[in-house]
A protein has these predicted regions:
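Internal alpha-helical transmembrane segments of multi-pass membrane proteins
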Residues: 107-129, 185
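Mid-bilayer segments of alpha-helical transmembrane spans in multi-pass integral membrane proteins
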Residues: 96, 100, 124-137, 163
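Interfacial aromatic-anchored transmembrane helix boundaries in multi-pass membrane proteins
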Residues: 28-45, 70-105, 139-141
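Hydrophobic alpha-helical transmembrane segments
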Residues: 18-23, 50, 54, 65-69, ...
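Hydrophobic transmembrane alpha-helices
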Residues: 2-58, 62-63
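Alpha-helical transmembrane segments and their cytosolic interface
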Residues: 2-25, 109, 113, 146-185
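Membrane-interface helix caps of multi-pass small-molecule transporters
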Residues: 33, 100, 104, 108, ...
Length: 185
């Protein structure tokens, strides 16, 4: 293939990734509206996490990181939710980690559908660990408390419905992208 066509191919992929990333960012803004402002429902399904995880799989770690980092702050500017400190700030780091990990793990794991699940689960664990570290640092800076039981409750116990929901939804969407041919094996 001549160099010109390789450049066009790369440019087309960059444009597609940018457009998809914009769509995923928009989904981060509007999906929480399905909770009707209920923080209990929002915490139960964590709707902002889904587009970021999918963005990492579909567009790559760089795009996933950017969408994850921007989404909580942009959502706060538009809807005044989530509260910017400490929730939104910790969430930005968590979502950026989701985007980075899902993108990197999808790239290095075999492209069989069954490997989407370990990539997703490891990404979710890594993002939650990042969230805990950031919350711990912010608590120390703010003179408040954040201990291991608060971490386990916030990252896992209270998040069980969201974890299950993400394990069901995210792989289905990633497999749909694969089926369309956008994600190459």
């Amino acid at each position: 293939m001549p160099l010109y066509f390789e450049r066009i191919e790369k440019m087309n992929k960059t444009i597609k990734n940018t457009v998809f990333s914009a769509m995923f960012l928009a989904l981060c803004l509007v999906l929480p509206l399905i909770t009707f402002g209920s923080t209990q429902i929002g915490n139960a399904i964590s709707p902002m996490h889904i587009p970021v995880l999918i963005c990492g799989f579909v567009c790559g770690w760089q795009y996933g990181a950017i969408v994850g980092l921007i989404a909580p702050f942009l959502r706060y500017l538009i809807f005044h939710m989530p509260p910017i400190y400490p929730i939104g700030t910790a969430m930005a780091f968590e979502l950026a980690a989701y985007g980075i990990l899902s993108g990197i793990l999808y790239k290095i794991f075999p492209k069989k559908n069954k490997f989407i699940y370990p990539a997703l689960i490891i990404s979710m664990l890594g993002g939650r660990i990042v969230w805990g570290i950031v919350r711990y640092i912010m608590a120390g800076l703010g003179g408040s408390e954040f201990n291991i039981s608060m971490f386990v409750a916030g990252a896992f116990t209270n998040a069980i419905p969201a974890i299950i929901f993400h394990i069901v939804i995210v792989p289905l969407v990633v497999m749909a992208f694969k089926k369309t041919g956008y994600l190459k094996d």
